[in-house]
Amino acid sequence: MNLTMQLAVIVAVCLCLAEGAPDVRLTRTKQQRPTRGFKNVEMMTARGFGKRDRPHPRAERDVDHQAPSARPNRGTPTFKSPTVGIARDFGKRASQYGNEEEIRVTRGTFKPNSNILIARGYGKRTQLPQIDGVYGLDNFWEMLETSPEREVQEVDEKTLESIPLDWFVNEMLNNPDFARSVVRKFIDLNQDGMLSSEELLRNF
């Protein structure tokens, strides 16, 4: 190769390098930094974005900021004004161990002398039959009739052998059911509900 050809190749290489250099710079300048949080260009100038622990420069009117504490509900303001202080506890998290004893339900303890343990009427299906008449009138006469048999069967049991006269007269006057049962048992022999002259005068 002669000298002119070498110079021509060198000039061509320099021109290629010169044309490629501005393109690389333009591509570097066109790249934008990645913005965090906002995609809108107008919202990229958010003041205080990403600042966590810096105090606010403006002092709000009715808010008194507290110092950050170790509790999870840090940064909750306390209000001085009664009108603003309606939402004083709004947003506060309940403490994990503070109200644990209040939430627990106390189980009942066994008290032997308690009235609740007595189940009155439990298991009773039917009530006792009510007796319309005078209690013991029919059984009274049956006892008189079967008194000899009872003496044979139960020697130790005291049998009814006599009735006081005053008690009998008083019961006949004041207790019509008792008087009716006496008449039916001793006078009305045929049990027809009618008293004949023979039944009334049979002992005379």
From Swiss-Prot:
Cleavable signal peptide: 1-20
Chief location category: secreted
Keywords attached to this entry: Amidation, Cleavage on pair of basic residues, Hormone, Ion transport, Neuropeptide, Secreted, Signal, Transport
InterPro entries from the UniProt entry: EF_Hand_1_Ca_BS
Ranges for region Disordered: 47-83
Tissue: Expressed extensively in the brain, frontal ganglion and terminal ganglion of the day 2 fifth instar larva (at protein level). Not expressed in the larval brain after day 4 of the fifth instar, or in the brain of the pupa or adult. Expression in the terminal ganglion is localized to cells in the posterior portion of the seventh neuromere of day 2 fifth instar larvae. In the pupa and adult expression is detected in the medial region of neuromere 6, the dorsal medial region of neuromere 7, and the posterior neuromere of the terminal ganglion (at protein level).
Annotated GO biological process: monoatomic ion transport; negative regulation of monoatomic ion transport; neuropeptide signaling pathway; positive regulation of juvenile hormone biosynthetic process; regulation of heart rate
Keyword Signal appears in the UniProt entry: yes
One GO cellular component, as annotated: extracellular region
Record PTM Phenylalanine amide, positions in chain: F49
Gene Ontology MF terms: neuropeptide hormone activity
The protein's name in its UniProt record: Allatotropin
